[in-house]
C-alpha cells in the first residue's frame, strides 16, 4: 500500500511539473479542453473552425443583435468599444488568434525565447503570433493598453498579417506607421492608439491563451464581429444560432416597418405578440422575398422552435 502511494505521488508530481513547463502556445488538446462547447470541425492547432459562410453572413449582423443574443445566453462580457479604427466604415469578421503581452521581466522572457527557439520560431517574439495566422484569422492581442513604446506592429508586420490572414488586428494597445498600414489594401485594425515609438520593455507571454480585451474575455477560436461601434467576441458554438436569430429578427423588423408604412397595422399590433393573422401575413411576405440571407431549409428549421 505504501509503495502504491509513493508511485501515485511521483506520478502526480511529474504531471504537475509537466503542466508547469513554459509554453508559447497550448497544445491542440489543451485548446480543445479550453473550448469544449464546440462540437464541429477544428483547425490543426485545436481552435474551432467556424464556417466561412457564417463568417460572411455575420458581417450583416448589427452589434446590438450580437451583443443582445450573447447576454441572453449568459455571456455579459463580450463587447469592447472606444477604438481607433484604421478603416471605420469597413466590417471585419474572423476566427480569433490571441496573444498576451506583459511588461518585460527578463527571466520569464528568456524562458519564452528559449522555448520558441526549440520550436524553430524565428525573429522577434512579436512576430510569432503572425506566423501562426491562417486565412480568415484575426490577430487579437492584449498589450495592456500601452501606447508609447507599446506599438505591436508597423507596416512591415501589417503586410505579413494581411498576407497570412486577409484580415487585420484588434489590439488593446497601439501600432505605428499608420500611413503604411492604411496603404495595405483590405487590412484593418481596431487599436487604442498610434505612436511613432517602437516596442520596448514588453514581452510575449503566450499565444492562443485566454486574454482580456477591455471589458471582454476572449478565447482562441472565438469569432469576432468588428464594426464602427466596437467589437463583439462570440463563442464559436453560438455563431450559427446567433446569425440565424439575428437574420430572423431583421426580417421581422423589415416586415413590421413595411406594414406600418402601409398603414396595415398599428404600432401596438406590431410591438406586442403577433396574432395568428399577422403571423400568416409575415409568412406570406417571407415567401415573396428574394435573396433571403438564409436558406429555406434553415428558415424552416429555425421557425419550428420560434416563440412568437
Predicted feature residues:
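Short acidic, Pro/Gly- and aromatic-enriched capping/linker segments at domain boundaries
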Residues: 22-42, 53-57
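Buried hydrophobic positions in well-ordered alpha/beta secondary-structure cores of metabolic enzymes
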Residues: 46, 161, 222-224
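Feature captures the catalytic cores and cofactor-binding loops of soluble hydro-lyases/lyases
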Residues: 57-65, 69-220, 234-283, 287-308
